[in-house]
Amino acid sequence: MGKEKNHVNVVVIGHVDSGKSTTTGHLIYKCGGIDKRTIEKFEKEAAELGKGSFKYAWVLDKLKAERERGITIDIALWKFETPKYYVTVIDAPGHRDFIKNMITGTSQADCAILIIAAGTGEFEAGISKDGQTREHALLAFTLGVRQLIVAINKMDTTKWSEQRFEIVKETSNFVKKVGYNPKSIAFVPISGWHGDNMLEESTNMGWFKGWTKETKAGVSKGKTLLDAIDAIEPPSRPTDKPLRLPLQDVYKIGGIGTVPVGRVETGTIKAGMVVTFAPANVTTEVKSVEMHHEQLEAGMPGDNVGFNVKNVSVKDIRRGNVCGDTKCDPPKEAASFVAQVIVLNHPGQIGNGYCPVLDCHTAHIACKFDTLQQKIDRRTGKALEEAPKFVKSGDACLVKMVPSKAMCVEPFADYPPLGRFAVRDMRQTVAVGVIKSVEKTDGKAGKVTKAAVKPVPRSSYAR
């Protein structure tokens, strides 16, 4: 056995009919963990329903009911392998929920794959000014996804035309406007359906000499989409940062006690550590840490862990609280925070006093837009107008926000997963935000359990 491969997360974005699901499905089919029998079953069912051409997209369908409707909605986490990586695909079909999932979702994508359909009319629709594609790409960029791969799909429908591949020039301008550097992007012509340039070089596009991208890490070259995924720069996982673990749930387990559960976002959690929960302001000792019912030496970023804490009742802490190391930049309640907010789809105008619900990590809390400080250019961040009266769809602004209940958030620059949020209103995501700074407070006097203030470990004077 060689060394374990690194994990990378990719998000697949693009216009609704660009072929996202088919392309993603094809990769999972060929490199993923789906067995032959399931695939054959899919093919048979698809043929019976007269949807033979959907068979790859079907790999992404878990729910029978969705199959009959002929569209994919389910956000599915799917995995496949490249020579270098284990890849998790965060499929992104349904637009509204996709946005929320991308922000509060379990994982920050390391790279976005933008799928553009080459068909005449399709391409133009995909990158038009108000297209979903622009929204998705902007969102990925705003949320800190800095690596991008562009796949020009459906080349089979253009008779594999080299001339049509020239749309990469327009696509290149398009991604540049969003904020990406086209030099650092692999542009690959593919057919997600036929499989050309997906895993193997296409025989239909002899004119394509391969892609090249240039980043700080150097120049890389390749022919296929798989090569491009393999050339993603490995993400640095934030183990060296202080611990931040947003709680998903808190359980009471007979004979063991209180067990909070959540995903380690930064740092590590170990037995014996003294931790603080914010904004509850509870401090105690971690007795043990486990994952998938096995004891763990240490929980690392990305691990979903359960841990047992001493003398804390399930009433003291709850979902949305954040656990951190008491001795190392412990988390605190946010009295207010300043965020860069992009309004995506709000039917009216947003002014001071607007109070929607924010979804940030596992917290779900109403926050007031206290003061609109500046309207800014969403690409450069430059100020366009000071103290605007209101903002509307398409605008970006700096806003001072005040939570209606105790809440723990962090600046995006310090702890990314705790520094991005979705603004929900009218059952949809109306805006997204990235936190610039936080005014912290110690909140109410907290509970410190006896376990947290042990003077000396017993072993040291039991000699």
Swiss-Prot record:
Tell me which Pfam families the record gives.
GTP-eEF1A_C (PF22594), GTP_EFTU (PF00009), GTP_EFTU_D2 (PF03144)
Q: Enumerate the residues binding GTP.
A: 14-21, 91-95, 153-156
From the Swiss-Prot or TrEMBL record, state where the protein is found. Cytoplasm
Recite the UniProt keywords alphabetically: Cytoplasm, Elongation factor, GTP-binding, Methylation, Nucleotide-binding, Protein biosynthesis
Q: Which residues carry this modification: N,N,N-trimethylglycine?
A: 2
Q: What is its main location?
A: cytoplasm
Tell me the residues on which N6,N6,N6-trimethyllysine occurs: 79
Q: Annotated region G3: where? A: 91-94
Which positions bear N6-methyllysine? 3, 30, 315, 389
Q: Which parts of the sequence are annotated with region: G5?
A: 191-193
Alphabetical list of InterPro entries matching this protein: EFTu-like_2, G_TR_CS, GTP-eEF1A_C, P-loop_NTPase, T_Tr_GTP-bd_dom, TRAFAC_GTPase_members, Transl_B-barrel_sf, Transl_elong_EF1A/Init_IF2_C
Q: Record's Gene Ontology CC terms?
A: cytoplasm
In residue numbers, the region (G2) covers 70-74
**Any idea which GO molecular function terms this record carries?**
GTP binding; GTPase activity; translation elongation factor activity
Region (G1) location: 14-21
Q: Which residues carry this modification: N6,N6-dimethyllysine?
A: 3, 315
All residue ranges annotated as the tr-type G domain in the record = 5-239
Region described as G4: spans on this chain? 153-156
PANTHER family linked to this entry: TRANSLATION FACTOR
Q: What does this protein do?
A: This protein promotes the GTP-dependent binding of aminoacyl-tRNA to the A-site of ribosomes during protein biosynthesis.
The Swiss-Prot or TrEMBL record describes its family as follows: Belongs to the TRAFAC class translation factor GTPase superfamily. Classic translation factor GTPase family. EF-Tu/EF-1A subfamily.
Q: What is this protein called?
A: Elongation factor 1-alpha
Q: What is the lineage of its organism?
A: Eukaryota, Fungi, Dikarya, Basidiomycota, Pucciniomycotina
Q: Which gene encodes it?
A: TEF
